[in-house]
């Protein structure tokens, strides 16, 4: 068992040693001794030594203000290094997930062994594979880009050090490079000084494409092709690329006033500029490689006399000059210059594809397939995956913004107030206007700034090259008129094609009404004509969990999807479900394979579209090899879910879920909404107020500046509870509901559900993962240090609940300890706890000092503030997810 982890452990301790040397060089022996003492006490405390636990608390409470920052930074940096070692371990030959690309082979073998699945059926399922990953800049990627680059290089060093045949001088050279990188990280400020702008976030997204996806996607397709050839004797067509990337960075304006129409326009141009930049590098390589002379008559006809001597090079040089022209024009536009479009400007993917594909066909026909299937094939696949836009963007806006804009317009036109009309009147007005030939917007109308912004955004969509914007997502969608309103605003902007408009259902009530809303829409003839048989619906995970607790939310999500799938199937509509999952459990995060197989049967027929958020992007796509691994996992899961769908839940299972849902929602809301002590307890037991000071994302932490838990965004809500290790949003209510159903004599039925129904077993698995990261003594320590005595009983009550919940989940899952079937994750949590515990204790101490200073009306000590930020970032690294 432990053989597998010894390589990981030795890398972690080597990196720790180098970090120790760096700290000693920078700050002297005494600080290193202090850090080492704390580490040893923490290790012993974890092993159950109470005296050492007490000493750990005393030591950290007695640190001077000068020692706070170095100690916090030491443990925080160590966790970043441990995460890097773990990321490397997951792709190293010695590691667990070195077998991830085999996932595809394993899945194909499993499918081939099914007596009722023909190879033709499997092949058809492969051909209809569709995977769209939507990168979002949630304010959760705590680590600065500059440190991420250094960690990627550390990864490269670890990879090279694994080479058995290294000469001594090579090993010494690599160790010297590691020391340099770790020293550079130590001497870099890990906390950003200001919040990133939406454009900075978009650039972060482009960096992921350049550093990882650009190489990772073609590598994944080679892997997929190899497995298909080996297992099914089937080759992927050249133009078959089942994966695409979309981004919310620069397009998501929901509750983020910093994302304006101008920003979106700028990001679209920047994205195209980055695409020309990356394709130019590819084409440069092809210019030097494709020196061949022999070509088909078709290719020779294409290049004419001028290019006959080196036909492939001739085409590549032409393409290169078009890319350079395009890049220069985009650069001028980005600088604000208004230039006419030059001749040869690239705006469509076909213009990139055609010359490349002509070369490919000619090389194949002339017996040079080995050359055609080299760099040229990779570039062709990049054209299909990224193309001229590089990544498409989604626009997301809150439904009330559209309602307010139309209200302002109808009042100006003197035809009443749209906002106060009934739903039936709204629909009648919208359908009438959608069918009308005359424009609705008056020429000389001067709307308010808010309405102007909504109209300008629609204008940007209408002007953007077709294919650069993927969808318009309406958050907090509640009614059919919410969807029709967006179609009308887009029509008024002069959009010439049917843009996918996706309602996002995200509260418990909205999820329960989702099917009704979509049924009404599909009953409108005009609407059916517009969508041409395709509909996208987005399911919100994070807000529903914050609204009703994780058990009720996940059942509502399941039922909404199930009903929508059946409604669309009956209506002959191809449904794409868009999953708005977060990285953490309380926001719907789950290991990809388990999460997909736990969805209702048929949910992946229209492909998978899912958000990849903040810090998860780095864990899943931070390196080309990890990209191959993540895409392979998704591919295997989609094929399996479509060809071996999970069972339809039995009626009795549905009834139990209904019961669990009602009880857990009541318990959850009983605390979060109805207990008068809850909000004051939350504010004092977690760093919620201090989190607002972290310059994390471009988006404010609250939708409205005042208000209680309901106005907090889902991310800071989860983030705060993750920091104090109570992890409350990810379990509150679930265990109590399970306990009640067990007391009603249904334990054996729950055990059957756990064994035979992926939806239910995944839910329990997610609870176990949260329980493994939660920590009762640390949560209690936060209470003792930070919470007023009269609120202590509430904290104790919540911790007792957590303890009971762990027992009931283990009983139903028939496990003696948490994470019994995922030892790799359990190992990883244990490894990091030794370094996370001191950060938690220190954070409670810093919050105590910082709040005391504030109560006494004194100026905050910058050393305390800075160290506090570092502990927040460090605990986030230790928990491997933020919000």
UniProtKB/Swiss-Prot annotation:
GO cellular component entries: cytosol
Catalytic activity: oxaloacetate + phosphate = phosphoenolpyruvate + hydrogencarbonate
MF annotations from Gene Ontology: magnesium ion binding; phosphoenolpyruvate carboxylase activity
PROSITE patterns linked to this entry: PEPCASE_1, PEPCASE_2
InterPro entries referenced in this protein's UniProt entry, alphabetically: PEP_COase (IPR021135), PEP_COase_bac/pln-type (IPR022805), PEP_COase_Lys_AS (IPR018129), PEPCASE_His_AS (IPR033129), Pyrv/PenolPyrv_kinase-like_dom (IPR015813)
Keyword terms, alphabetized: Carbon dioxide fixation, Lyase, Magnesium
Active site: 138, 546
Cofactor or coenzyme needed: Mg(2+)
EC nos: 4.1.1.31
GO biological process terms on file: carbon fixation; oxaloacetate metabolic process; tricarboxylic acid cycle
Pfam family, one: PEPcase
UniProt cross-references to HAMAP family, sorted A to Z: PEPcase_type1 (MF_00595)
Alphabetical list of NCBIfam families matching this protein: PRK00009.1 (NF000584)
Family: Belongs to the PEPCase type 1 family.
Record protein name field: Phosphoenolpyruvate carboxylase
Lineage, uppermost ranks: Bacteria, Pseudomonadati, Pseudomonadota, Gammaproteobacteria, Enterobacterales
Gene: ppc
